[in-house]
Amino acid sequence: MTKKQQEVMMMIYKTQDEVIRQLYEQAVRVRENAYVPYSGFKVGAALLGKSGKIFTGCNVENVSYGLTVCAERNAFFKAVSEGETSFAVLLVVADTPEPVSPCGACRQVMAEFGDFEVILSNLSYQIKRMFVHELLPYSFDKDNLNVGK
């Protein structure tokens, strides 16, 4: 680990300290389980429910690309299947030059569950912090379904 990486890692430890560190470590760990025989692009996600429980997900590719499930959605679907529907923070990590950004489908799934913090990161310990509304402004939501009723 370079000196700069160590400094950034120390910053992660100092920001919301333990929780962010746990999310980062779990996302990096679950990333190794990614099934990516076609792209080789592994992504890990760790999602903190408001209950305090952490749910993880990795991307799972399919030869029929449209059936691929991203790490972020995998974490959300796991959380919902276990009864969690309120979230505080999502952290996503990949081996990219800049912190990895979620795809549009994942952004829409995030927006379904509110405007919580999203932390984009990479294996170089860089992070970008934002909220769901910044990733997907003007999102389609339940209010759109009531138009004209």
PLM feature spans:
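C-terminal binding/interaction regions
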Residues: 2-33, 82-149
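Short Gly/Pro-enriched turn/cap motifs at secondary-structure boundaries
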Residues: 35-38
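Short beta-strand scaffold segments in enzyme catalytic cores
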Residues: 40-49
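Histidine- and/or cysteine-centered catalytic micro-motif in compact active-site loops
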Residues: 48-50, 59-60
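Short acidic-glycine loop/turn motifs at beta-strand connectors
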Residues: 49-51, 123-124
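Compact, glycine-rich, soluble single-domain proteins
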Residues: 59-74
